[in-house]
Amino acid sequence: MKTFLSIGSGPGMGYATAARFAREGFQIVLSARNPTNTRELADRMKAKGYRAEVRTVNSADPDSVATLIAEVEKLFGSVDVLHYNAASIRQATLSEQPRATILQDLAVNIGGALVATQAVTQQMSERRSGTILLTGGGLSLAPNSEFISLSIGKAGIRALTLGTFESLKGKGIHVATVTVSTAVAPDSDAAEAVAELFWHLHSQPIDKWTAEVVYPG
């Protein structure tokens, strides 16, 4: 059974994407900082007959992210699909934020994605297979000064994806992002649509691999 690891598993795109892969027979591992909320999501999945486990992770802490991936690889044998969905959404301009919150936001919004990608590619490279899915944002295309730390983070997600796409493809790893350019509520048609796009990216044959899809298109 293949394993899908979600980092930053919220009730919107995180849950919808995990459920989409669960329908295809994946073992799901949901992870976030708040284990109570994550367990509720896992219970919803189990009620539908899906396999779902819960882990706690601090996406701002590189050691926490790397330890999570190593634990999942040891327990289930592999991480076949990684979905990095963690984000710190703070409405504040650069001048309104103290240095500590800027760095904290960036640690979640891009730092955790960098660490997760680096950690998971080692075993994926040995297998010459794997998918890394990153939740992007329209702020990477049109930055907003009122959400400056998120804008920088989503720009980083896009750069990480496009900057590693070809090199990872040569190792059999598909890294891709859905650049989400609208607000997405839990249990919404939009969340389901984004999940479907992530599944589409994962399902592409290697000669059709793409790095980015924008939603809505």
Positions of PLM-derived features:
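Catalytic Tyr-X3-Lys loop
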Residues: 88, 95-114, 157
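Conserved glycine-rich cofactor-binding loop
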Residues: 10-11
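Conserved glycine-rich Rossmann-like NAD(P)H-binding loop of the short-chain dehydrogenase/reductase
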Residues: 26-40
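Active-site loop of short-chain dehydrogenase/reductase
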Residues: 78-79, 124-136, 170-173
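C-terminal helical subdomain
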Residues: 170-217
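Amphipathic alpha-helical dimer-interface segment in Rossmann-like NAD(P)H-dependent oxidoreductases
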Residues: 108-126
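Rossmann-fold cofactor-recognition segment
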Residues: 45-63
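Catalytic loop of short-chain dehydrogenase/reductase
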Residues: 105, 131-156, 162, 169, ...
